[in-house]
A protein has these predicted regions:
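Conserved class I S-adenosyl-L-methionine
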Residues: 1-24, 37-41, 124-153
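Class I SAM-dependent methyltransferase SAM/SAH-binding core
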Residues: 29, 35-85
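A short acidic, Gly/Pro-enriched loop at the edge of an enzyme's catalytic core
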Residues: 87-96
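A short glycine-rich, Lys/Arg-flanked "PGG" loop and its adjoining helix->strand segment in the class I
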Residues: 109-124
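Short alpha-helix
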Residues: 161-178
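Core SAM-dependent methyltransferase catalytic element
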Residues: 177-178, 192-200
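Conserved S-adenosyl-L-methionine
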Residues: 180-190
Length: 200
């Protein structure tokens, strides 16, 4: 069971679950949860009323079920795309978060409004994403994706879109969607080992 919660790329330093605020008794959603390690940590150590870990990957969902299925019903592992999930979950969540998850891999003009609708009044969205591209290239100055090489669970070549955007671009997107009290922090990676992270 993960005993720490990290936002940075290296998963080894910086702020932890406190960035989410007090989630005790709250309904929480992890967007693009992968193997649900962050969601499992919250379920065990921070006592939310309910936490839903959403991921579309069958392989990730299977691994999460093997590792953390025993944490039900507090932890719900949901195999689904984040957009359809959020669009059918209006005013469900007190807190939504993404640790290098769906926020970086979903068109922000679609995801951010869906997240805003799924949050209850006064709800919070917190996420971490790349502050620059993995190869060191700067983040995009406008809303455009980068094509990434990937592999399917069967090992076949595939492509993914990733949105690596400059701070002012994210800030404008969040503001246009209606989010308020927007703040950001750059978590610097170890030189030569890990990229910098931007946490919102």
């Amino acid at each position: 069971m993960p005993d720490r919660f990290f936002w940075n790329w290296g998963q080894d330093s910086g702020p932890g679950a406190e960035a989410l605020g007090d989630v005790t008794g709250r309904c929480v959603g992890d967007l693009g949860a992968g193997t649900a390690r962050h969601a499992a940590h919250l379920a065990v150590h921070h006592q939310p009323a309910h936490i839903t870990a959403v991921d579309a990957s069958p392989a990730q969902h299977a691994m999460a079920s093997d590792l953390y299925g025993h944490l039900a019903p507090r932890l719900c592992l949901t195999r689904c795309g984040v957009l359809p999930h959020l669009r059918t979950s209006a005013h469900t969540y007190d807190v939504l978060y993404s640790v290098f998850g769906a926020i970086g891999f979903t068109e922000p003009h679609e995801l951010l409004p869906a997240a805003a609708t799924a949050l209850r009044p006064g709800g919070r969205l917190t996420f971490s994403t790349l502050a620059h591209h993995l190869g060191g290239a700067p983040a995009h100055p406008d809303v455009q994706h980068t094509d990434m090489s990937a592999k399917t669970p069967d090992g076949e070549a595939a492509h993914m879109h990733r949105w690596v955007l400059q701070e002012q671009v994210w800030r404008q997107l969040l503001d246009e969607t209606g989010f308020t009290r927007i703040s950001t922090e750059v978590l610097h990676g170890q030189p030569g080992r890990a990229p910098s992270t931007r946490s919102w």
